[in-house]
């Protein structure tokens, strides 16, 4: 019997502090310019950037948060909204705990895309994903609502 199956190695591994209790993979999808990257950066860094930078392919970030005394490591995948990257985007649905469907409330077409394209893509390529969350973004642009009231 090798040492890896008993005693010494197992003890070394278990003595290391756990990095997290729960791991969540979240994927952001939606048309270009709806604010997916801004949502991710706001959650991860707590900052907002007025300048738009296209996501090329995908970007991902991690953040560890505490929820009810449990350390949760959140991995957020920010996918490109441009059509030329949509086939790449669908490969990231696998293993996702949630997919956030993001639209711009000032752009009706971005909302229509959710039902006309994104839902079908998720059903076709990510059928095991149970948690679909619809996010209407850019409320501050639509009504001039101060950030403090959001």
Segments from the language model and where they lie:
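Ras-like small GTPase catalytic G-domain
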Residues: 3, 8-29, 33, 38-46, ...
